[in-house]
Amino acid sequence: MVKAVTVLNSSEGPHGIVYFAQEGDGPTTV
């Protein structure tokens, strides 16, 4: 299982948080 948390930042500061979890062996696209 792969877990990752990505924080998107912009000139205004924190723009949003993207969370995705993957199980098995499949391609992950962001």
From Swiss-Prot:
This is Superoxide dismutase [Cu-Zn] 1. GO terms for molecular function: metal ion binding; superoxide dismutase activity. It is found in: Cytoplasm; Endoplasmic reticulum. Binds 1 copper ion per subunit. Keywords: Allergen, Antioxidant, Copper, Cytoplasm, Endoplasmic reticulum, Metal-binding, Oxidoreductase, Zinc. Inhibited by KCN and H(2)O(2). It is an enzyme of class 1 (oxidoreductase). GO terms for cellular component: endoplasmic reticulum. Expressed in fruits, leaves and pollen grains. The keyword Endoplasmic reticulum applies. It comes from the Eukaryota. Belongs to the Cu-Zn superoxide dismutase family. Destroys radicals which are normally produced within the cells and which are toxic to biological systems. Probably involved in the protection against oxidative stress during pollen development. Its cofactor is Cu cation; Zn(2+). It catalyses: 2 superoxide + 2 H(+) = H2O2 + O2. Its EC number is 1.15.1.1. The keyword Endoplasmic reticulum applies.
